[in-house]
């Protein structure tokens, strides 16, 4: 596990991302292809924010050799086939979103998962939010404002 990190194991996490000594916290991003507790990257965050992740790797079942996850595409009624494995959203817990940052980050992580990386990044830009998108080919897309705060930990992944 990364030193001085918050392991993001819940649907969403709210925290003041400054430690008592004033340094940033590191939020670990789960490796969707790895064992539970293995991380593919970390995001260093300061300030107060809510962080949410939607992924296809924890809640699923296999029937007739096909894997079905829990994130449904409302246009088909079936599990999303956006090509993504995981989407992590960072929503500042301040300004106009202060009261609803947790709900917004959770909703946006699911919406962006269904939309796919390109449309999901566009949606985040409209809302002024940040995110990390991981696709099935282990390609990672990171929004511009947190690109310098994201560290890739796993050599099998590449950043777009």
Language model features by range: what are they?
Residues 1-160:
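Mature catalytic core of soluble alpha/beta enzymes
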